[in-house]
């Protein structure tokens, strides 16, 4: 069996990329390890901004087909003690994940994409030193499929990327416990009508939030923490001690993980592309990755289309995926990730000062992140941020250690963003660029 584009992973990222390539007239095959009645069942509910349906040309959610669950337009982000809320206005659609993934599968199939469900990825196939397909298992039988280009959309396990040999062109690292968020979702019933939700609220100090769910009398209380689910539960206890939550009863829990680390430096190698959670393309502020991955895939689809038409799919021919992404959303995300990684070391009272003085958590920044616009981080904005922290030290509300840590984090954020803006236009100089990036990321460290 042969095709132009082979995609491993058929959920949101795999389906989006399949549609993009199939509508260009290429033969596309999608493998997914889950059966058709289980695909996209990691969580029941997920959210997407309404404007992103038009932005990415996605099929709309509908009550008629069971994809639509609810809708809200106001989001709040509050301090550790529930003060100084920052408001974002962006209509959000809540959807049933399994049903919407199936709809995206059908959407890709409309343009000719072929899906093979229950196909467990085994290993890449190489010919002449380049990937030319994969081996997989279905119904207990080992099979092979060949392709001009293989795309890893297999989620955070990154089955294809992590099975590539060292030095192939894309890093093959696996995620450790401090490279991801451990997410616990409490689906709850709200006991008082006055507490029914018409929007969401987040408390980034605890990495917690409350949002509507499919039951209009209910809510989802979520937390994402590094290292382990037990750490998440310990932080949730502190959250409950400091934030007054509406009276509620637990209905059920969902647990999962999402990447929270830097992306591979390169997303492309000979006959190969990695994207989605397999490439750690999640938003620094909340760990979500569906639409941020689509930004990357729009770039990848354009570059790959040109490469396939020229019948040239070497690393050099796909390199523009790296430069276009790393110099735009990639650079902005690196800046935010660096700042937040250092900011989490501040104490709750210091975060209160951050919120009161629009340090990091300002409405312009929050709205830019929400809408996907360019993040307003001009030199003046950054300079005022550092000055505000320094004033907090003089007032005795910010410790000198926090000034050093957060201020140093801002400087590292500037350094890593500027470095990504200088991403090499070709593989020449890439190794040298990586060595410097490694040094900066080592200083930034991991989220705690």
Label the model's feature ranges:
Residues 6-8, 22-42:
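Glycine-rich FAD pyrophosphate-binding loop
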Residues 33-76:
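N-terminal FAD cofactor-binding segment of flavoenzymes
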Residues 10, 111-245, 280:
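Predominantly flavin-linked oxidoreductase catalytic cores and closely associated redox partners
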Residues 14-15:
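N-terminal Rossmann-fold NAD(P) dinucleotide-binding loop
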Residues 121, 227-301, 307-309, 313-331, ...:
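FAD/FMN-dependent oxidoreductases across multiple families
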Residues 87-106, 159, 226-234:
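Short beta-strand to alpha-helix junction loop
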Residues 305-448:
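C-terminal helical "tail/cap" subdomain of flavin- and related membrane-associated enzymes
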């Amino acid at each position: 069996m042969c095709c132009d584009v082979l995609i491993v992973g058929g959920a949101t990222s795999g389906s989006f990329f399949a549609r993009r390539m199939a509508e260009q007239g290429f033969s596309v095959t999608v493998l997914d390890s889950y059966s058709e009645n289980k695909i996209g069942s990691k969580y029941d509910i997920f959210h997407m901004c309404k404007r992103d349906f038009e932005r990415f040309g996605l099929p709309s959610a509908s009550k008629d087909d069971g994809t639509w669950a609810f809708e809200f337009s106001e989001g709040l982000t509050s301090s550790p003690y529930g003060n100084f809320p920052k408001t974002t206005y962006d209509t959000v659609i809540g959807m049933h994940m399994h049903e919407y993934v199936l709809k995206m599968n059908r959407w890709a199939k409309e343009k000719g994409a072929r899906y093979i469900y229950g196909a467990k990825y085994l290993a890449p196939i190489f010919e002449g030193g380049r990937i030319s397909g994969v081996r997989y298992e279905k119904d207990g039988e080992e099979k092979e499929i060949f392709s001009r280009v293989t795309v890893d959309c297999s989620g955070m396990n990154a089955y294809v990327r992590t099975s590539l040999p060292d030095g192939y062109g894309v890093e093959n690292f696996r995620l450790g416990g401090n490279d991801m968020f451990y997410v616990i979702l409490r689906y709850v019933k709200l006991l008082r009508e006055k507490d029914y939700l018409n929007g969401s609220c987040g408390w980034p100090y605890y990495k917690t939030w409350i949002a509507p769910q499919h039951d209009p009398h209910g809510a989802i209380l979520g937390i994402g923490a590094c290292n382990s689910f037990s750490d998440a539960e310990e932080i949730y206890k502190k959250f409950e001690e400091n934030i007054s939550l509406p009276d509620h009863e637990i209905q059920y829990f969902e647990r999962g993980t999402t990447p929270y680390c830097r992306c591979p430096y390169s997303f492309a190698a000979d006959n190969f592309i990695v994207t989605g959670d397999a490439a750690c393309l999640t938003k620094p502020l909340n760990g979500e990755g569906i639409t941020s991955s689509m930004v990357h895939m729009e770039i990848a689809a354009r570059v790959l289309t040109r490469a396939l038409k020229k019948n040239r799919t070497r690393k050099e021919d796909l390199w523009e995926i790296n430069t276009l992404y790393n110099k735009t959303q990639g650079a902005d995300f690196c800046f935010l990730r660096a700042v937040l990684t250092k900011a989490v070391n501040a104490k709750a009272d210091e975060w209160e000062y951050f919120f009161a003085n629009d340090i990091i958590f300002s409405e312009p920044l929050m709205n830019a992140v929400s809408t996907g616009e360019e993040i307003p981080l001009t030199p003046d904005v950054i300079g005022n941020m550092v000055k505000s922290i320094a004033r907090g030290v003089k007032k005795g509300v910010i410790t000198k250690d926090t000034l050093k840590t957060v201020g140093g984090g801002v400087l590292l954020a500037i350094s890593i963003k500027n470095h990504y803006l200088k991403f090499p236009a070709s593989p020449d100089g890439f190794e040298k660029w990586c060595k410097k990036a490694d040094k900066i990321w080592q200083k930034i460290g991991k989220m705690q």
